[in-house]
Amino acid sequence: MTGKLIWLVGPSGSGKDSLLEALRKQEHPQMLVAHRYITRPAGAGCENHVALSEHEFFTRAAQHLFALSWHANNLYYGVGMEIDLWLHAGLDVVVNGSRAHLPQAKARYGESLLPVCLQVSPDILRQRLEQRGRENALEIAQRLERAARYTPQQCVMLNNDGSLLQSVEMFLHLIRTHGNHKESQHACL
C-alpha cells in the first residue's frame, strides 16, 4: 500500500465529526475521508454515514465487503473495502475509527496506519457534551470517566481545545510531517 490510513479516534464530544466535516469541505486531492456504514438511522447524530439495517450490515459482512468492522454502543460499524483501493492508488484515507479497535486496524494495515487521537481537556469535553444535548448528566459523567481512563498507545496526539480551523490545520500538518512514526507524538495548540 502506498497511501496512509489515518485512524482518527477520540472520546465522544472531542470533535471528530466536526473535524471530518471540515476536511470534506476542503480540497485535498491526495486525501479522502471514508464514510462509515452504521446500523443507525441516517438522521441520527451528526456523522455523515451510510445507514444500514442490521440485516444489510450482516449481509455485507458475510460478503467480506468491510475492510474493518466492530460493535460498540449497541451499534455495528464498518468501513468499506473501497478504502483498500484508495490506499493502493496512493491516496491517504481518513477514517473515524474506534479507540478500542485500534489493534484490529494495526493488524490489518501495519506500517500504513497512522493513528491520530483527538484530545480535549475535561472541562471543554464536559461543555461540548452538555451543549450537544444528546446525553443526560449520568451519561456525560460516564463519558468523561471513559475519556480519562482510556488513551490509546502509539497514537499521534492532537489537542482539540482550540478552534476548528486550528485543529484542521494541525491535523493536516501532522499528516504531512509525522507519516507513520512508531513513537507517540504530541501536537498542542
From Swiss-Prot:
Residues engaged in binding ATP: 10-17
Catalytic class of the enzyme: transferase
Pathway as given in its UniProt record: Metabolic intermediate biosynthesis; 5-phospho-alpha-D-ribose 1-diphosphate biosynthesis; 5-phospho-alpha-D-ribose 1-diphosphate from D-ribose 5-phosphate (route II): step 3/3
GO biological process: 5-phosphoribose 1-diphosphate biosynthetic process; organic phosphonate metabolic process
Pfam families linked to this entry: AAA_18
Record's keyword annotation contains Mitochondrion: no
Enzyme Commission number(s): 2.7.4.23
InterPro entries from the UniProt entry: GK/Ca_channel_bsu, P-loop_NTPase, PhnN
Catalytic activity: alpha-D-ribose 1,5-bisphosphate + ATP = 5-phospho-alpha-D-ribose 1-diphosphate + ADP
GO molecular function, a single term: ATP binding
The keyword Nucleotide-binding appears for this protein: yes
Taxonomic superkingdom: Bacteria
Keywords, in A-Z order: ATP-binding, Nucleotide-binding, Transferase
HAMAP family: PhnN
UniProt cross-references to NCBIfam families, sorted A to Z: phosphon_PhnN, PRK10078.1
Protein purpose: Catalyzes the phosphorylation of ribose 1,5-bisphosphate to 5-phospho-D-ribosyl alpha-1-diphosphate (PRPP).
Family in the record: Belongs to the ribose 1,5-bisphosphokinase family.
Name of the protein described by the UniProt record: Ribose 1,5-bisphosphate phosphokinase PhnN
Gene symbol of the encoding locus: phnN
